[in-house]
A protein has these predicted regions:
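Acidic/histidine-rich, metal-coordinating catalytic segments
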Residues: 240-242, 282
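Conserved, mostly hydrophobic/aromatic
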Residues: 126
């Protein structure tokens, strides 16, 4: 089967069996971090942040270990696993190396990489939506470069090859100033200038996706981010296709003649140079809504290309197994999930309860 389904961030199947929050990612806001620092000292705040990050990494590994059992072999990790340590938009800068459990975190990252490779699960990440390499604001560019390099640092430490098989997917998020070839070239050259400032391994992993509105529909993205950059610098970008973006922001090669999705999919597929592409598939609750449906109305079509489709649906893997295990859906829910939850993930549950209890105690107002 050419169609491979990918899970995005959370597992509803696991949450359903353990609704106490054990399978929910935990973060720490700058305000809460500062509050703990004021009440108990910065070491305590760093310790609390480190515990939450390790919980998130444990949960990530648990999901990666679980999804092959329901025939899902791709996983988009949360871009917020590291909470404040990967947030470069705040004035508070916390480095992972500052955390007291830094060595445990590194060990867990390596374990995640091993588990993914052992289970033939590929990973991707979709950084914060404010990331753009097209801007005249140096602070925006610096923040974007820092965050993209950070996600690359994770993949490097997990032991993955530095190529698009574990992509960091972003959108241009900036249109040409006017609708002309010259202005578009200036826009893309601005991107490329900043792209060159990224770590080499980050460049190898970076993938660009078409947008739901504005200039960067599928054809324009291919024309300039792949063809132009390839002709000009011998470095055309790898492109990720979004079916919703293509539907809402359709493409034309000739005026009045829309390009069919299969054509865009084929063009984008070729930019991956032999790596199985990671694309995005979704259905929304209405024509203008950004909210995905609970369940897909039909299976993802087979476009005669090997593709891993990140499946954007509210019910996550609970929706996906309707297509990956249609004859065994009830069995998966009742037997497989229960066994795995009770045995395999007890450690993650207990860890979550322990550090939440510690935080609840430390955050109570002092008399």
């Amino acid at each position: 089967m050419n169609v491979k389904y990918g899970l995005i961030i959370s597992s509803e199947l696991l949450k359903e069996k353990e609704p106490d929050g054990s399978y929910t990612f935990a973060g720490l806001t700058q305000k809460t971090f500062s509050s703990i620092s004021e009440q108990s000292g910065q070491e305590e705040a760093l310790s609390e942040l480190g515990k939450r990050i390790l919980h998130n990494l444990d949960l990530t590994e648990n999901i990666i270990d679980f999804i092959p059992k329901v025939n899902i072999n791709h996983y988009r990790i949360s871009s917020s696993i590291f909470s404040l340590a990967s947030d470069f938009s705040d004035s508070l800068i916390v480095k992972v190396s500052d955390l007291p459990n830094y060595k445990d975190i590194l060990s867990k990252i390596r374990s995640i990489g091993f588990t993914a490779r052992q289970n033939s699960v590929t990973l991707s990440v979709y950084p914060d939506s404010t990331n753009t390499l097209i801007s005249d604001d140096d602070s925006i560019i610096e923040r974007t470069i820092s965050e993209l390099n950070f996600h690359n640092w994770f993949f490097e430490n997990a032991g993955f090859p530095s190529n698009a098989s574990n992509p960091i997917i972003i959108k241009p998020l900036a249109d040409p100033k006017i609708d002309s070839h010259k202005s578009t070239v200036e826009c893309v050259q601005k991107f490329y200038e900043n792209f060159q400032k990224l770590d080499e391994e980050t460049q190898n992993r970076l993938v660009i996706q078409n947008e739901e509105s504005g200039y960067w529909n599928a054809v324009n993205l291919f024309k300039y981010f792949h063809v132009y950059l390839n002709e000009k610098y011998d470095e055309g970008m790898t492109l990720s296709y979004s079916n919703t973006a293509d539907d809402r922001n359709s493409s034309e090669l000739e005026k009045g003649v829309s390009v069919e999705p299969i054509v865009n999919i084929g063009a984008f597929h070729e930019t991956w140079k032999g790596v199985v592409p990671v694309f995005l598939w979704s259905e929304k609750t209405s024509a203008s809504s950004k909210t995905p449906v609970d369940y897909l109305s039909n299976s993802i079509p087979d476009f005669n290309y090997g593709i891993k489709w990140e499946c954007d649906v509210k019910k996550r893997d609970k929706a996906i197994i309707k297509f990956t295990m249609p004859q065994e859906e009830d069995k998966v829910t009742e037997e497989v999930i229960t066994t795995i939850t009770k045995n395999k993930y007890k450690k993650s549950r207990d860890s979550s309860r322990a550090f939440n209890a510690l935080y609840d105690a430390s955050s109570k107002p002092q008399n």
